[in-house]
């Protein structure tokens, strides 16, 4: 099997934005997940909307949606895309002291939305941290990963 080549580097190793102009417009989607782990008392405050900064879950959800739309401004070689859907779900696990974040992004375009889904999850997690850091600076953010993608030349992907 031939080694895969990095598409964002030219033959001299210089960074470049990939030319997708000859690719067909297809329906594409990507889903990513991540987690914020915190003290049970912090999660209780979030669940009861008891933080001074406001409703942490809804602010974080909106931040994730906004981040997906701004991915090309944050990651230098990402294409700006006309995203057709961003959905951010947050699930609290009181026993584990976690908020699980899942983002799904869709587009009809010439390139995928994996980075947009990952960015949405990352910024959602960061926003949860920001909203609750006054009561719990020991929170951790982790396990951010792509879990699924559909469409495009490389085909579908589902994490194991």
Swiss-Prot record:
Its EC number is 4.6.1.17. Keywords: Lyase, Molybdenum cofactor biosynthesis. SUPFAM superfamilies: Molybdenum cofactor biosynthesis protein C, MoaC. The active site is at 130. It comes from the Bacteria. Homohexamer; trimer of dimers. This is Cyclic pyranopterin monophosphate synthase. It comes from Parvibaculum lavamentivorans (strain DS-1 / DSM 13023 / NCIMB 13966).
């Amino acid at each position: 099997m031939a080694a895969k080549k990095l598409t964002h580097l030219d033959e001299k190793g210089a960074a470049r934005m990939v030319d997708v102009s000859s690719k067909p417009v297809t329906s594409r989607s990507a889903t990513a997940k991540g987690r914020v782990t915190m003290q049970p008392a912090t999660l209780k405050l979030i669940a009861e909307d008891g933080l001074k900064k406001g409703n942490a879950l809804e602010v974080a959800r909106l931040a994730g949606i906004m981040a997906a739309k701004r991915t090309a401004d944050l990651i230098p070689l990402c294409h700006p895309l006309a995203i057709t859907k961003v959905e951010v779900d947050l699930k609290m696990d009181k026993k584990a002291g976690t908020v699980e974040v899942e983002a799904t992004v869709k587009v009809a375009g010439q390139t995928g939305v994996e980075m947009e889904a990952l960015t949405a999850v990352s910024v959602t997690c960061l926003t949860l941290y920001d909203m609750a850091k006054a009561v719990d600076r020991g929170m951790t953010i982790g396990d951010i990963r792509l879990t699924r993608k559909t469409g495009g030349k490389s085909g579908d992907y589902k994490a194991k």
